[in-house]
Amino acid sequence: MRELAIEIGVRALLFGVFVFTEFLDPFQRVIQPEEIWLYKNPLVQSDNIPTRLMFAISFLTPLAVICVVKIIRRTDKTEIKEAFLAVSLALALNGVCTNTIKLIVGRPRPDFFYRCFPDGVMNSEMRCTGDPDLVSEGRKSFPSIHSSFAFSGLGFTTFYLAGKLHCFTESGRGKSWRLCAAILPLYCAMMIALSRMCDYKHHWQDSFVGGVIGLIFAYICYRQHYPPLANTACHKPYVSLRVPTSLKKEERPTADSAPSLPLEGITEGPV
């Protein structure tokens, strides 16, 4: 119980840091006159995939898949616990890393011009006249948090399904339905990332790098709890594969149980 409490505490701390960084102001990068065209895209009020919906998809999809697998395969509580710990760590680390990069880089969004100058008229001092909160949020383009969270949560779901379905083991290779089922979450993550470019909220580099960050954390945290996808036991977490200490002690040979040689018929020779 103590180890579990520590694991939960680490994740709570990471999510706390993520929420804290949401309210910090980013670096105010100088915008050169010759690059202002990059940030003159229209300011879209209604996103295709709002932030709340993105978080719901990224957090609830892996949890729902884990619960469905438990019902179908009747997995034990230990396996459920390991899966929850893995995906929660991936999401927490991803949030902290993405927000840290956002604050340090301070890249303007594609619609930054109209956040800064709502009337479309730029002054010579380049001083923004728009809402300060809207302007500050407009300096958090790189990397895309929509993309990173989508690929973190849904990317983990892909790894989890690939392990459960044995997509890359001898028994599962060549069965296309298994592969299609496993990569479906990644397809959804890609759609979320691309929607941010359609909303003029991110440049293509923002969505691409965000996706890479999310996928890296998803794989790292998955491998912390599960064996490689090519392993024959890839459907089980490491905890379930460990041999209990009591069994190890029973199997260990002792001096009393060591085999002895028959002594009958053996006579002492000259020394």
Curated annotation (Swiss-Prot):
Per UniProt, subcellular location reads as: Membrane
Q: Name one Pfam family in it.
A: PAP2
**Region annotation Phosphatase sequence motif III: where it falls in the sequence:** 195-205
Q: Which GO terms describe its molecular function?
A: diacylglycerol diphosphate phosphatase activity; identical protein binding; phosphatidate phosphatase activity
EC number, UniProt record:
3.1.3.4, 3.6.1.75
Which positions does the site annotation Stabilizes the active site histidine for nucleophilic attack cover? D206
| Broad class of the protein's primary localization | membrane
The regions listed as transmembrane in this protein's record are 4-24, 49-69, 84-104, 142-162, 179-199, 202-222
The way its activity is modulated is described as: Magnesium-independent phospholipid phosphatase. Inhibited by N-ethylmaleimide.
Ranges for the region named Disordered are 249-271
Provide the active-site residues from the annotation: H146 (proton donors), H202 (nucleophile)
How does the protein associate with the membrane? Multi-pass membrane protein
Locate the region Phosphatase sequence motif I: 102-110
Can you cite an annotated GO cellular component?
membrane
Task: Specify the enzyme's EC class, one word.
Answer: hydrolase
**Pathways involved:** Lipid metabolism; phospholipid metabolism
Q: Positions of the region Phosphatase sequence motif II? A: 143-146
Tell me the keywords, alphabetical order: Hydrolase, Lipid metabolism, Membrane, Transmembrane, Transmembrane helix
Reactions mediated catalytically: a 1,2-diacyl-sn-glycerol 3-diphosphate + H2O = a 1,2-diacyl-sn-glycero-3-phosphate + phosphate + H(+); a 1,2-diacyl-sn-glycero-3-phosphate + H2O = a 1,2-diacyl-sn-glycerol + phosphate; 1,2-dioctanoyl-sn-glycero-3-diphosphate + H2O = 1,2-dioctanoyl-sn-glycero-3-phosphate + phosphate + H(+); 1,2-dioctanoyl-sn-glycero-3-phosphate + H2O = 1,2-dioctanoyl-sn-glycerol + phosphate
The UniProt function text for this chain reads: Magnesium-independent phospholipid phosphatase with broad substrate specificity. Preferentially catalyzes the conversion of diacylglycerol pyrophosphate into phosphatidate but can also act on phosphatidate and lysophosphatidate. Phospholipid phosphatases are involved in both the synthesis of lipids and the degradation or generation of lipid-signaling molecules like diacylglycerol.
* Protein name from the UniProt record: Phospholipid phosphatase 4
| Species this protein is from | Mus musculus
Coding gene?
Plpp4
